[in-house]
């Protein structure tokens, strides 16, 4: 509950977009900043794309159901087994990576941009689960007892995620009433197009976690980075929040 009348909100540390999403459900126009391009993409997709999808619900759902069928019955991945992936191949079993890349190819071939973005988010949402990695605070290699064989079933997890998204579009997309607007990756450099009534945020956690490195699999999958060498460049744009984060980086605005 917001105790004042609010028509516009700014979220300087967007994260996964909780504040803009709730604002949009109340019909409040929101603006946000987020240094992680993958997280910014997720936020825009689950608000703006889902809102737009509600206007052409049947078409979007039909496309997603067709994609689901192609992934389950017609996925051509054998020729991708053993491909190099700019050093990221070490994080996956060879067949898992081949299937991820085959599904990504199907997604990129979709002609409908809303369905394409929704499907990208669906694929990115399973990438850690089907990899050799696990998130326990930070992203790290999973120990032998931390993964089950079914965790590596790419087609199962992707199609299950599509089912969840199709349900949400069918029954909940009308709850998203207002768009959100990405203004700048860095909150310190953001220029808002108008005065806002309210700033609501969950500031960066003081825990030393590197949220760029934590999403490196998603960043790579959706082509926000090519190699791990680009991660420090993205990370340097963030606000240092934790003693373990302090480094000798230069020329970082305060």
Where are these regions (language model features)?
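Class I S-adenosyl-L-methionine-dependent methyltransferase catalytic core
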Residues: 1-11, 18-201, 205-254
